[in-house]
Each structure stands twice: as C-alpha cells, then as structure tokens.
C-alpha cells in the first residue's frame, strides 16, 4: 500500500493496521493460542501470487457445544489506509473473492471510517476501524454459510504466513505469545 492516512498527527500505514489486527486477535488460555494469525497470505505457493489476503485469523476454539458447536472459524481481512485504495478494491471484486470464499467472515479494516462511504460496503462484509492500538467492529460481518475448502496452495501459504507472522511477533510484547510461552515453560530464565 503506497498511500497513508493521518491518525491523529501520525501517518497510518498498512503495517500499523496489521499490528492493530495482531493486537485484536492476541488471545490465549491453557489450551494455547486462540487464533492462528497470518499476514499477507498468497493465493498460490509459487512466485506467481497475484492475489494476497492482507490478514487471516483462524479461531482455534471450537465455540458452542453439542449440536450448536460451530467449529473453528476463519476470518479474512482486507486492509485499507486510503480512500483511493478502497475505490480500487471496489473496481475489482474478484480480488477479495479469491479468499473470501474460504472464510467464515470477511472484514474490511480501515484506518478511518471516512474511507468507506455509506452504502459502499459489499453485502456480507463487516467493517473494522482503527481505535488506539487495536480495531473496533463498526459493522458485523455476515457468516458465510457456503465456505469452500481451501486449495492445497492456500493451505500451504496460510501455514507459511502463520509461521512468518508468529516469528515476527515479539513474545515479550505480544500478550498471547507471552502467556503461551509461560504456560509452555518457554520463558527466558534470568541468572540470579
């Protein structure tokens, strides 16, 4: 993303927005991390990746019990930090569809609410807006009841992106990784 918007007096970049998404999905308990977080998931495993999903978060907690069990849910995110970038997205609906079909929920994530005008949000999409160091849901996404199974290429690129994202996050700074490291006894020991 080349364009940036101002958030307060600072320019907001895609990296800033991805950090906010990582904060939103930083959660864990005794069973481990709640979300597998992945930045920049490609549609193919090779070099010819024309389509990239900005961010995916797979909820690893099953949700519900018995017949109401929902199973893990995949959230896909398209990040926009400028109005012109959003308008480009609207002109090419196939870009989002390359990934949306695999997701239970699809979100547009913007640095400012003014990037999206009333009536522009495609049917079924949710909207998240930057607030502080995280994002807040402004419009809930509809659940996609016709989720398609991921191709082997997308499975591979998702796994690679989860690994890269987890390695990039600092376990001292990321609350989910910090808790998980403590539970797994992976905390750094200091000499006395």
Residue ranges and their predicted role:
Residues 41, 59, 80, 131, ...:
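Residues at the C-termini of beta-strands that transition into short coil/loop
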Residues 55-66, 80-86, 171-173:
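Short low-complexity stretches enriched in small and charged residues
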Residues 7-9, 24-75:
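Active-site metal-binding core of divalent-cation-utilizing nuclease and nuclease-like domains
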Residues 14, 39, 78:
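Acidic-residue sensor for enzyme active/binding pockets
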Residues 71-123:
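Catalytic cores of nucleic-acid endonucleases
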Residues 1-35, 45-46, 118-192:
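Non-catalytic C-terminal interaction segments of nucleic acid-processing enzymes
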Residues 42-44, 62, 82, 113-115, ...:
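Short, solvent-exposed loop/turn segments at secondary-structure junctions
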Residues 15, 52-54, 90-93:
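Short amphipathic alpha-helical segment that frequently serves as the phosphate-/nucleotide-binding helix
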């Amino acid at each position: 993303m080349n364009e940036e918007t101002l958030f307060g007096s600072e320019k907001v970049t895609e990296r800033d927005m991805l950090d906010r998404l990582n904060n939103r999905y930083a959660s864990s308990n005794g069973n481990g991390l709640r979300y597998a977080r992945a930045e920049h998931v490609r549609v193919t495993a090779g070099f010819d990746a024309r389509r990239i999903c900005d961010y995916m978060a797979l909820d690893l907690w099953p949700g519900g019990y018995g017949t109401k069990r929902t199973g893990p849910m995949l959230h896909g995110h398209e990040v926009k930090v400028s109005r012109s970038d959003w308008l480009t997205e609207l002109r090419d609906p196939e870009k989002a569809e390359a990934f949306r079909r695999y997701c239970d929920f699809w979100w547009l994530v913007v640095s400012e609410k003014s990037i999206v005008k009333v009536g522009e949000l495609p049917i079924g999409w949710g909207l998240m807006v930057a607030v502080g160091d995280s994002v807040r849901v402004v419009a809930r996404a509809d659940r996609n009841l016709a989720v398609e199974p991921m191709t082997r290429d997308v499975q591979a690129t998702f796994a690679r992106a989860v690994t890269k994202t987890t390695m990039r996050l600092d376990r001292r700074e990321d609350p989910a990784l910090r808790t998980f490291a403590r539970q797994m006894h992976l905390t750094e020991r200091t000499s006395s």
